[in-house]
A protein has these predicted regions:
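Conserved glycine-rich cofactor-binding loop
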Residues: 8, 15-17
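The beta1-alpha1 cofactor-binding region of Rossmann-like NAD(H)/NADP(H)-dependent oxidoreductases
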Residues: 41-42, 62-74, 110
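Catalytic Tyr-X3-Lys loop
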Residues: 99-121, 127, 131
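Conserved glycine-rich Rossmann-like NAD(P)H-binding loop of the short-chain dehydrogenase/reductase
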Residues: 29-46
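Rossmann-fold scaffold of SDR-type NAD(P)-dependent oxidoreductases
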Residues: 12, 85-93, 109, 132
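Catalytic loop of short-chain dehydrogenase/reductase
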Residues: 93-99, 129-173, 185-189
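C-terminal helical subdomain
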Residues: 174-182, 196-234
């Protein structure tokens, strides 16, 4: 716990699902948590309340991660509120939404991730870390086929991972490390539920192939571990 006491962590897309569980896990370890949400303030405030009732510290900050002004405000608010920005967890993703434009997946999963990483790096101290959350379907998209509906997400998240890895030299100069965390289909997430609705039996098939699928909380535990894990950058 002492390792994270007083440290500040921004977690994008943390008003629900994996991000919300990660926020509560890290808050319990003493970190100051910035719960980021795009539009559902009550949901984000509920996570903040749960953290505070458990004795932790957190704030909710609205930011559409595809909007650079919102990203700058997110970073500034974290520093102004808690005095530092020590860790950034790039958890927010998407691309299966309708009516957002053909380039939305790439703007969200590649451009926004890199933009926020760069803005955060300007405020982060030596020893800080950025954690990028992805999926096996995205990480291995060049070797393994995925469902057509998920392909824009997978390809854009892989592009985001590549963009962040290319940023490692610049981050290393500042003493900031990058860690990529990946998992197979996560049971109970919006994406998994939607894909299973489009392809009945998809979750069961993935479970049989993989042997086991993480639950939301199990994957959140793994992400939380990577914040302070002694691993090489990249």
């Amino acid at each position: 716990m002492a390792q994270l006491t007083g440290k500040t962590i921004i977690i994008t897309g943390s008003s629900r699902g994996v991000g919300a569980d990660t926020a509560q896990i890290l808050a319990a370890e003493g970190a100051n948590i910035v719960v980021n949400y795009r539009s559902k303030a009550p949901r984000a405030n509920k996570i903040v309340k749960a953290i505070e009732e458990a004795g932790g510290k957190a704030i909710a900050v609205q930011a559409d991660v595809t909007n650079n002004d919102d990203l700058q405000n997110l970073v500034n608010t974290a520093v102004e509120t808690f005095g530092s920005l020590d860790y950034l967890i790039l958890n927010a993703s998407g691309g299966m939404e309708t009516g957002m434009g053909e380039d939305y997946a790439m703007r969200l999963n590649r451009d926004a991730q890199l933009n926020l990483a760069r803005l955060a790096a300007e405020k982060m101290p030596e020893g800080a870390r950025i954690v990028f959350v992805t999926s096996h379907q995205a990480h291995f998209i060049r070797e393994v086929e995925t469902m057509d509906e998920y392909r824009p997400v997978a390809e854009s998240k892989r592009a985001g991972e590549d963009a962040l890895i290319a940023e490692i030299p610049a981050l290393s100069e500042k003493g900031i490390s990058l860690v990529v965390v990946s998992a197979d289909m996560i049971e109970g997430t919006v994406t998994a539920t939607l894909l299973n609705r489009l392809h009945p039996g998809a979750i069961e098939q993935r479970r049989e192939t993989a042997g086991k699928l993480y639950t939301v909380n199990e994957f959140a535990q793994e992400i939380a571990k990577m914040v302070t894990a002694d691993v090489e950058t990249g």
